[in-house]
Amino acid sequence: MQAYILINCNTGSETNVIAELKELPEIVEINGVWGKYDVFIKIRTPDPNGVEQILKRLRNHPDITDTFTMHVLYGQGGSIDQES
């Protein structure tokens, strides 16, 4: 199961939140971003229950104030490799 999660953090906590989240093996990509959200993560888990477990951890984090989750629809799209 793959999902993208957008995260809002308490002001000034973004660097610490990113450092802590980097320790979770399910997170395969993490970036600080500008805009409505502060952090963008991509996760992979063996099943939907794994996504729920990650969301529970995120929502219980004292510096995470909001999340927005997008589950990947398999068979629609995928990575696009571009040659220079």
Annotated model-derived regions:
Residues 1-84:
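A compositional/biophysical signature of low hydrophobicity enriched in polar/charged and small residues
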